[in-house]
C-alpha cells in the first residue's frame, strides 16, 4: 500500500502539471479521481499501523511509517490544488506555459499513428523510459482515461499518450509514434526583464526544486543518509525564500496590468510547490532526528515504480571523465540524476557541463529496468541473487560475487 501511495501521489503531481501545461480540465479531474484512491490508501495504512503497534517499541517504529504516510498525503493534496487552477479557471499567463517547456522534467503528449513503431505493441516492449527518457503517466483512448498502466498494456492507433521526462527525448518519441515534427512553445526574449518574468522564472525553479527535494527525501529514507536529509532541508528553505520573492513580484506585476486575474494561478502554483517541499522535509525529519525507521519503508520505497539507486563511477568507465550532456543519462538509461556525491559533499541538480570523475557516486531515480544500463555506464555489472533477489554491483570484467 505504501509503494502504491507513493506512486499515486507522484502520478497526481505529473498529471496536475500536465493539466496546467495543456490547459486540460479532464486531466485535472483525473487528479481528483486519484485523490480519492490516495485517501483510501492513507486511511487503510493508518488503520494497519494502529493495529500493528502492540508495544511501545512497535509504536515508535510505526510512527515513522505514519510520518511518511502523512507526507505522501500532503503531496497528493498539493497536486489537487495545482489541478484546481485549471478546473476553477484561476488563470495562468501563457508565458508560464512556454517557460515550463524549459523545466528539467517536461510534459508532452503524442498520438500513436497506425503503422508506427508503437502501434499494437506493449509498453514493456516499447520501453519508453529507457529508449527516450520519458515515462507514460496517462493514456486517453477515445473518451476514457487510463492511469494505472501495466507493462502488458497494448498501445493502439489513436491512443493519446501523456508523458513526463527529459525534453531531449521528445524528438525520438515522436518518431516512434509516427507523429509530425514538434516545435516547442516560443519563449519571447525581452531585454527588459519585468516582474512577471521574474515571477515565472522563479515558479519554474520552484517546480524543479520541489521535485528534487521529494526525490532526495525518498533517497534519504532508503539510504538513511544524514547528508541527503540536510540537503532537503536546505532546498525547503530555498523554496520558502523563492515563494516570498514571487509573491512580491506578482503583486507588482498585477499593479501594472488592467486585468490581474491571470496572476492568481501563479500564487496557487507557488503555494503548491512550497507544500511539496514541506512534505519532503517532513519525511527527512525522521533521519535528521535519528528516529527508528521501520524496515517496511525501505522495502516499500524500493518496490515503487521508480527506484532510488546509488552507483559509483569506476575508473576507466564510459562515464569517467565525461560531461553529463554527451552522456545523455536520462535518454540512455531512463534515470534522472538527483545528485552527485563527491568528496563527502552533495552536488544536487548538476548542470550538463559537470564532468564525472572516478569515485563520484551518482544518486538517481528511474525505472528498475534501466538500472543495469546505468550500472554499465559507470563500469559495473548488476548481478541479482537468485535466492534473495538482492542486487549487487560488480566491477565490469571482475570476478562474480561469492554466493
Task: Annotate each PLM feature.
Residues 1-403:
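Cytosolic, long alpha-helical scaffolding segments
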Amino acid at each position: 500500500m505504501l509503494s502504491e501511495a507513493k506512486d499515486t501521489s507522484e502520478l497526481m503531481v505529473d498529471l496536475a502539471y500536465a493539466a496546467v501545461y495543456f490547459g486540460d480540465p479532464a486531466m485535472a479531474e483525473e487528479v481528483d479521481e486519484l485523490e480519492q484512491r490516495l485517501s483510501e490508501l492513507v486511511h487503510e495504512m493508518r488503520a494497519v499501523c494502529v493495529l500493528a503497534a502492540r508495544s511501545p517499541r512497535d509504536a515508535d517504529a510505526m510512527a515513522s511509517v505514519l510520518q511518511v504516510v502523512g507526507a505522501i498525503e500532503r503531496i497528493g493534496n498539493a497536486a489537487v490544488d495545482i489541478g484546481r487552477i485549471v478546473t476553477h479557471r484561476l488563470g495562468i499567463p501563457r508565458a508560464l506555459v512556454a517557460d515550463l517547456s524549459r523545466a528539467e522534467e517536461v510534459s508532452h503528449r503524442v498520438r500513436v499513428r497506425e503503422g508506427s513503431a508503437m502501434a499494437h505493441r506493449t509498453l514493456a516492449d516499447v520501453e519508453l523510459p529507457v529508449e527516450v527518457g520519458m515515462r507514460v503517466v496517462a493514456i486517453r483512448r477515445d473518451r476514457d482515461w487510463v492511469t494505472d498502466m501495466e507493462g502488458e498494456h497494448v498501445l493502439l492507433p489513436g491512443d493519446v499518450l501523456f508523458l513526463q521526462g527529459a525534453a531531449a527525448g521528445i524528438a525520438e518519441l515522436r518518431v516512434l509514434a509516427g507523429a509530425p515534427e514538434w516545435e516547442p512553445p516560443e519563449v519571447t526574449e525581452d531585454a527588459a526583464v519585468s516582474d512577471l518574468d521574474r515571477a515565472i522564472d522563479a515558479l519554474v525553479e520552484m517546480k524543479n526544486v520541489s521535485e528534487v527535494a521529494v526525490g532526495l527525501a525518498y533517497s534519504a529514507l532508503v539510504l538513511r543518509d544524514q547528508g541527503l536529509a540536510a540537503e532537503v532541508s536546505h532546498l525547503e528553505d530555498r523554496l520558502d525564500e523563492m515563494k516570498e520573492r514571487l509573491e512580491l513580484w506578482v503583486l507588482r506585476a498585477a499593479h501594472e496590468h488592467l486585468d490581474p486575474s491571470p496572476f492568481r494561478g501563479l500564487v496557487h502554483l507557488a503555494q503548491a510547490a512550497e507544500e511539496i517541499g514541506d512534505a519532503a522535509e517532513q519525511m527527512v525529519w525522521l533521519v535528521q532526528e535519528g528516529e527508528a525507521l521501520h524496515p517496511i519503508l525501505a522495502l516499500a520505497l524500493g518496490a515503487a515504480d521508480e527506484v532510488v539507486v546509488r552507483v559509483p563511477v569506476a575508473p576507466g568507465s564510459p562515464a569517467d571523465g565525461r560531461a553529463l550532456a554527451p552522456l545523455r543519462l536520462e535518454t540512455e538509461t531512463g534515470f534522472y540524476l538527483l545528485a552527485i556525491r563527491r568528496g563527502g559533499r552533495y552536488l544536487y541538480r548538476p548542470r550538463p557541463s559537470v564532468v564525472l570523475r572516478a569515485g563520484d557516486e551518482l544518486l538517481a531515480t528511474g525505472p528498475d529496468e534501466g538500472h543495469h544500463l546505468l550500472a554499465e555506464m559507470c563500469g559495473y555489472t548488476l548481478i541479482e541473487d537468485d535466492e534473495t533477489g538482492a542486487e549487487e554491483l560488480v566491477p565490469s570484467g571482475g570476478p562474480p560475487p561469492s554466493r
